[in-house]
Amino acid sequence: MRLFSVLTATVLLVTRASAQSPVTIESLTEDLARLESVREIKNVQRTFAQLAHYGRFQLMASFFADNGSLRWGAGTGANILDDSDAAAITGPAAIETWLRTDAGKMDGLQPGSLNTWINEQPVITLSADGKSAKGRWHCLRFMGDGKGSSRIEGGIFENQYALVGERWKISLMRYYPLYAGSYRDGWKNVGGKGLPVIPYHYTPDEAGIPILNQKPSAAPEGKSLSPEELVYRISQLNEEDEVRNLVHSMGYYVDRRMWDDVIDLFTPNGTISVDSNTSPPGASGLQSVLNRMGPAGLTRGILNDHPIYQTTVELAPDGLSAIARGLEIGMIGDHANRSAQWQFCTFRHTLVRDPDTSIWKIQNLNYSRLLVAEYAAGWASGGILPARASPPTPPAFLLGFLNYSSSVPRRPESWSPLLREGVHPTSELLPDLARRLLRSSSFDETENLSSAYGFYIDDVRCSLFGDLHAQKGFKASPGIGWYRSPSRITTACAARYGPNTASLNPAPRGSIPFHWRIQLVVLTSHDGRSSTLRGRNLQTGTGLNSTSGFSGLAGFNGGIYHDQMVLEEHEGKTRRKIWSLTIDEFYWNSASWGTGWANVDRASSLSPLIKRRSAMEKRQASGSLENFPPDVSIKDPLFGTRYQGFMGGPPPSVSWPNILPMYWEYRNPVSGRVPSGGTYWGPGCVPCRVKPDWFLTNNGYEEPATGPTLISVNATIAKGDGEIGDVVVVTAKLSAGPEETIWGYVELRKGNRSANLMGEVLLDNEGFASFTVPKGDLKAGQVSQLVVYYAGNDRVKPGRGAVDVLV
Ligand SMILES: *[C@@H]1O[C@H](CO)[C@@H](O)[C@H](O)[C@H]1NC(C)=O
Ligand SMILES: *[C@@H]1O[C@H](CO)[C@@H](O)[C@H](O)[C@H]1NC(C)=O
Ligand SMILES: *[C@@H]1O[C@H](CO)[C@@H](O)[C@H](O)[C@H]1NC(C)=O
Ligand SMILES: *[C@@H]1O[C@H](CO)[C@@H](O)[C@H](O)[C@H]1NC(C)=O
Ligand SMILES: *[C@@H]1O[C@H](CO)[C@@H](O)[C@H](O)[C@H]1NC(C)=O
Ligand SMILES: *[C@@H]1O[C@H](CO)[C@@H](O)[C@H](O)[C@H]1NC(C)=O
Ligand SMILES: *[C@@H]1O[C@H](CO)[C@@H](O)[C@H](O)[C@H]1NC(C)=O
Ligand SMILES: *[C@@H]1O[C@H](CO)[C@@H](O)[C@H](O)[C@H]1NC(C)=O
Ligand SMILES: *[C@@H]1O[C@H](CO)[C@@H](O)[C@H](O)[C@H]1NC(C)=O
């Protein structure tokens, strides 16, 4: 059987690459527990932040272990790193009191108050025994009391977590404050001094340690899971990845007002709800809601960004539906009339999986507005919406987090076989489960590395982020081009940003540019060894003064990362590493905190306006790369118009409020639609079209699929030869994205995958296959569903197409 020989080849590759020892039920059980732990820790921290929005202090405190503590650096002492002046509170009861007191009237409960708490960009480190963990996060709070007072606080968490019984708890929440201020004046460095590097709990090498296969480790205490339970739980993780990607992709389409792509993501009766007003089901209802944001496409001066933060996902036990919950902050503006808005929304979206194709779609986008404010007036006085006299009711929290003290089982006991790609002979099940688990851990390892990079670049630690790259990995230096290898990346960075950046323990810095790498869409290869990442770069910063010059960094810039990551074997170690790092920036920026992204006029009521600030990276650069040419220049003619308008690219340059093109590494995840206007740049790394030997596929890695494999199927009744009589001719056409090759066999079955096999056919070069079925094989007078299955290959996803036939 050709079909299974394809699968076997893949399985062997995985076994060789990722496991020294054979995959067993025990090793899978242990690895699964590790990955589920990493996810639960993220869910704990993200839900903690979600609870703050609604002043649920008791529940927030219930996430702490009984002897867990909170240390909240006050930043008034000699040194932010010095614990001695940090508030130190132990135990859930005292922590609840502290949280409540700290929020005061800015608790999200008082009429007009706002308590937005963001925790993002996690680097999670699980201990070897799987019982404790550390996590670094960005933390940012936008708060207001509705009566004119506001607070902004930003900094870094270096937290610790412990497995207590069945659940992960916070054992230490350690906050290092870096900047603070108010809506009126913006923010600046706490203490008005230079800021140290907050110690990292990881090294570049450690940041890439795979989650799985941590041998030797403690012997498993519990019993091993059954194969069925493993299938169930691993499938749920795989599906969770798809859901998260879909929600985050939707956000990017909304930002660019790509309404056709947004609508493609919905079921035929999909809806959008805002504050419980729900659109009529279907495309026209969706279109009318989307049109309220404006017509399709962005024109000069329009900002429609909706960054998505701290998404948590809960799968239904049957794996056919899911809820995604999180925070979306609309940053809306029209530069032409100098108007802008903040829109703080909780979302709680419902998604469903099409059981036929296994493709996830949106059933309902559901937004509950926390607060909407004009940029000029801000959120301190309650904004313009919603007018609310009583405290808001939070949309339900996920994953049993509303009662975190109770010992809820971490996963349902029941199971159902949810293998996306059909059934395999038992002997192939365990290696295939290992591959599926690796695909999900690739998601978290990619986020880990992405976040680790984000923190290092904030602190401009050249050698540290150089070392996050693979030996043959490459990184773009904005406006210049790509440098390949950790040492060349490090040298380029130091040449550009100056010698202080090479020191592991640099002097305090007057200003820090923050790179929030959030809203990740991670496309994982079939074997789980490589991934393609799209991420938002929401750049902000802090400085000594909030209101002047470069140090007046309390504004925002927007960019997009297009990266790839690989599992590299080097000097006997296996590590997840950055293969390719590319940033397209800046799509927009705030001239200052005062004026925001739409040049809002706040001069009458606020502090003096700040001088217009050009690209932050450029300003910060103190050196020059003239004597250190890149391996690939963004001026390379082979890029064509790819970098036209971007800093360093071919003229004319395009800067906000003009609109730069936005590029895509994937097709629409539901419809397979290819982004128009030459903005599709996939598959493969951005500089790969200039350097084909940089393609993953030329380096022993698989290129992740860029979207669904679509199968359209036709059936016609034709005259067979005399002996057979009439036949049903079934024709299938398979398609994926440009430059994605479909090859292999397709099967025709009557009904589902375990039902009758009616034929197996090799695809032709155009992706067509045709089957001839004797009419007598189908029940006369009855509709038969004929299904064409494709197992996928190392470049494209599996697919399924069906046709109903009445003979
Ligand atoms: C907290 O309690 C756990 C279990 O009782 C114990 O293992 C741990 O050492 C304690 N932590 C601290 C900081 O006391
Ligand atoms: C949408 O349509 C599907 C299929 O017809 C149906 O099962 C489902 O109940 C509908 N959902 C809503 C919210 O109308
Ligand atoms: C500015 O233009 C937008 C449309 O882009 C409109 O919605 C908004 O009301 C206008 N604001 C002002 C203050 O005129
Ligand atoms: C949207 O969310 C609100 C608030 O949680 C809820 O009351 C409403 O039922 C949801 N709407 C849909 C269509 O799910
Ligand atoms: C939480 O769970 C515990 C233990 O199951 C139970 O005693 C308690 O009443 C629950 N609390 C809430 C608010 O549901
Ligand atoms: C993240 O990096 C740490 C080292 O800092 C490593 O131990 C851990 O396994 C990685 N976690 C994930 C989720 O990749
Ligand atoms: C910060 O502001 C003070 C006045 O408030 C000014 O003297 C100082 O030069 C400013 N520093 C910077 C770095 O702009
Ligand atoms: C199905 O039939 C229609 C009409 O004859 C034709 O346009 C289309 O190309 C066919 N599709 C396939 C997959 O054969
Ligand atoms: C597959 O089809 C067979 C035969 O029609 C049926 O008995 C079986 O329940 C189906 N299985 C699933 C998972 O739908």
Regions found by a protein language model. Give the residues of each.
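Fungal secretory targeting signals
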Residues: 1-20
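Short, low-complexity N-terminal intrinsically disordered segments enriched in polar/charged residues
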Residues: 20-50, 54, 58, 62-66, ...
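A solvent-exposed, acidic/Ser-Thr-rich amphipathic alpha-helical stretch
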Residues: 57-139, 259-330, 462-543
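Short beta-strand edge/turn micro-motifs at domain boundaries
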Residues: 132-134, 154-203, 207, 321-323, ...
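Short, cysteine-centered beta-strand-loop-beta hairpins and adjacent loop/turn segments enriched
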Residues: 141-151, 180, 330-341, 372, ...
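A hydrophobic membrane-anchoring alpha-helix module
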Residues: 177-180, 185-225, 370-372, 377-427, ...
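Solvent-exposed beta-strand/loop surfaces, strongest in extracytoplasmic domains of secreted
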Residues: 704-807
